[in-house]
Design a protein with these regions (language model features):
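Bacterial N-terminal signal peptides
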Residues: 14-27
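Catalytic-loop region of hydrolases
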Residues: 34-103, 107, 115-124, 268, ...
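Cap/lid segment of the alpha/beta-hydrolase catalytic domain
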Residues: 111-185, 231-232, 374-387, 394-396, ...
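Alpha/beta-hydrolase fold nucleophile elbow
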Residues: 186-196
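Gly/Ala-rich beta-loop-alpha elbow adjacent to hydrolase catalytic centers
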Residues: 195-199, 203
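A catalytic-pocket lid/entrance helix-loop region that shapes and gates access to the active site
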Residues: 205-207, 212-314, 453
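Short beta-strand/loop motif that positions the catalytic acidic residue
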Residues: 416-418
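Histidine-bearing beta->alpha loop at or near hydrolase active sites
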Residues: 449-462
Length: 530
């Protein structure tokens, strides 16, 4: 089976190339598996048409300004598709439906961005939003990953790194608003942003740096501790480099972890609801081999490697990323005939390089050192030393500023979600950021920012937990009607069939089984603060 087949099974999306960010293409609404599925229950009729075009689509080509150039404006399938470029190379697209609902929806990018405007996955996402009446917006953030794959766009280019870090999304949102207003003779009443992974980082960056850009922001699995994440990817790959685990060994590892932790929530259901309750130590809890290297036991080198794998990431004496919780080792549902653990193909990949290796290596070659070196071997990185470009990298790429006072003051609403079984980005970073915001912003953080942790969900979607849910509709209800979401009903699907449902609870509450009702039904669970 090829790496692409694995990714299709795990991510439920077609992928073109392993190096084009793979499953991180799930940054946009498709990662949610069920965007707009709750539209019928919405308190806002966001499908209602409020305006139509006030000029021809083609006439927008004359709208070029000093801030952006309109490259083309063409009528396609009941909408006006506008493409343009912002100096220097930030390409963007705005699609304007003939029947507009008065809202703008911008989608984020996965991984290291650069997905072209023609990218099939992103086009499908925008078409889905377009069908609801949104004017849709998208940008490649300043580079084309078909030409500059990975982080090669940052090779000796600080400007492109800044465009990727935050400038591309901001400038595109400004250009899009002008184009929308010109076409309909009416500005968007509400502006939204949605993204997962790097798209989640972009979402938090917008709230922190440009609080007036979006009224409602949906941030999924945000990679906001970007630099720490990259060190984590390298650390975990380095831990397993000399003695990589086989697929059989990962399944054996998962068996022992789930045997110890699955029922901590009172239910033995194949889902670790909150891995913080799980006390797992490889040296204590895994069977040790005596003699032959068998797949049902672990030798000393493997146990030592796993101990390092689950440890905090320390660089030059500073903890830059928390220890990874357990949970992503388990298998997800059967997608396209593939049953695989969450570690596949992130941590292990029989078909090629693990994704953590693919996604992390370019950070050391083109970003975190002043002197770029395309030949740099990340496995040689000395974690006792501090890279000479680290602080600048943090300033440009990390979205960790907890002071969201300006976003709150502007009545913005931030809804975030994160899978507890994410094999790439540590879910604990979402909780720590939420709690930091709570500590620094005056008033009740729940008034404008709510976080929903998703038990058993892998990176942005999939996994053994309830990973199919609509977070867009609750966000719109919150922004436009002031109805804050206390819970979101999620389901676990296999071949479009609902196997069970659970409520996702606003942090710090968690779903607790009432001990009476059917365990497959969300009504048998209550959101409680433990």
């Amino acid at each position: 089976m090829t790496a692409i087949q694995y990714q299709q099974g795990l991510c439920r999306l077609p992928i073109q190339l392993l190096l084009t960010v793979c499953c991180l293409n799930l940054s946009v609404l498709t990662a949610k598996a069920a965007p707009f599925s709750d539209v019928a229950e919405s308190r806002v009729n966001y499908q209602k048409v409020i305006a139509g075009p006030k000029q021809t689509c083609r006439s927008l080509e004359s709208m070029t300004t000093t801030e952006f150039t309109v490259v083309s404006a063409r009528q396609e399938n009941g909408a006006c598709r506008v493409t343009g470029v912002i100096p220097r190379e930030i390409r963007f697209e705005v699609i304007l439906p003939d029947g507009w609902n008065g809202r703008m929806m911008m989608t984020g990018n996965g991984g290291l961005a650069g997905q072209p405007l023609e990218d099939e996955n992103y086009r499908k996402t925008r078409e889905h939003m377009l069908a609801q009446g949104f004017a849709t917006v998208y940008t490649d953030t300043g580079h084309d990953n078909r030409i500059e794959s990975g982080a090669t766009f940052a090779y000796r280019s600080v400007d492109k790194l800044i465009d990727y870090g935050y400038r591309g999304v901001h400038l595109t949102s400004q250009a899009a608003k002008r184009i929308i207003k010109a076409y309909y003779r009416k500005a968007p009443k509400y502006n939204y942003f949605s993204g997962c992974s790097n798209g989640g980082r972009q979402a938090l960056m917008a709230a922190q740096r440009f609080p007036d850009d979006f009224d409602g922001i949906l941030a999924g699995a945000p990679a906001n501790q970007f630099t720490g994440l990259k060190f984590s990817q390298a650390h975990r790959m380095k831990a397993l480099k000399d003695d990589p685990l086989t697929l059989a060994e990962v399944k054996e590892l998962a068996k022992h972890i789930y045997a110890r932790c699955d029922d901590k929530d009172g239910l033995k259901d194949g889902v670790i609801s909150d891995p913080r309750s799980c006390d797992f130590e490889p040296a204590r809890d895994l069977p040790k081999c005596s003699g032959a290297d068998l797949t049902t036991c672990f030798d000393e080198e493997e146990i030592e490697a796993l101990t390092s794998f689950y440890s905090p990431i320390i660089v030059a004496g500073e903890e830059v990323y928390p220890a990874f919780p357990v949970g992503s080792e388990g298998e997800g549902a059967n997608y396209g005939g593939v049953i695989a653990p969450g570690w596949m193909p992130w941590v292990i990949n029989p078909a090629g390089r693990p994704l953590l290796d693919v996604l992390g290596s370019d950070f050391f070659r083109y970003i975190v050192f002043v002197q770029d070196n395309p030949a740099y071997d990340w496995s040689s990185f000395d974690f006792q030393t501090k890279p000479d470009n680290l602080e600048f990298t943090r300033a440009v790429l990390d979205a960790t500023n907890p002071d969201l006072s300006a976003y709150k003051a502007g009545n913005g609403k931030l809804l975030s979600y994160f899978g507890w079984a994410d094999p790439d980005i540590n879910p604990l970073t979402a909780i720590s950021y939420h709690d930091e915001v709570d500590a620094i912003v005056a008033g009740d953080v729940d008034d404008f920012y709510r976080l929903f942790m998703v038990p058993g969900m892998f990176h942005c979607s999939g996994g053994p937990g309830p990973s199919s849910f609509d977070a867009i509709t609750p966000l719109i209800n919150w922004v436009e009607k002031g109805i804050a979401p206390d819970q979101i009903i999620a389901t676990h699907l296999e071949n479009t069939q609902v196997l069970f449902s659970r409520p996702l609870c606003a942090h710090p509450k968690v779903a607790v089984y009432d001990g009476v009702g059917p365990v497959a039904e969300a009504t048998s669970f209550q959101c409680q603060k433990l």
